[in-house]
């Protein structure tokens, strides 16, 4: 399956993509795709890094250089509220982070790469497309293999 040009990482996928053993995959991903991050995803990532006593000011500058950080725009806030209200009517509750991350992916017309696609299942009917992180990594590895042949 060809991957779309635009992707969005949720916070756990972002953390995993920035682990040492994913360095090459991350480099290829950044070279081949426009990677969007919700500002809420950035916040969660920086919280994890601050917990590990990292220099989050410097890390934030790096994130701004390599990713398209999407602020909580009016359109995203309104769409997220509509989605959440619809889910609440169906007695489905999701974390605000997940709703905003998913809405950001919908807004940017990008594939949401996540370690846990089931979390986002109720939002798929609003136009969200998801892919498990492990499948995305395999697809990127295949892209690299094909280029080497």
UniProtKB/Swiss-Prot annotation:
InterPro entries: PIN-like_dom_sf, PINc/VapC_TA_RNase, VapC_family, VapV_Thermo. One of its GO terms (molecular function) is magnesium ion binding. It comes from the Archaea. Residues 8-125 form the PINc domain. Keywords: Hydrolase, Magnesium, Metal-binding, Nuclease, Toxin-antitoxin system. This is Ribonuclease VapC4. CDD domains: PIN_PH0500-like. Belongs to the PINc/VapC protein family. It is an enzyme of class 3 (hydrolase). Toxic component of a type II toxin-antitoxin (TA) system. An RNase. Homodimer. Its cofactor is Mg(2+). Its EC number is 3.1.-.-. Mg(2+) binds at residues 10, 98.
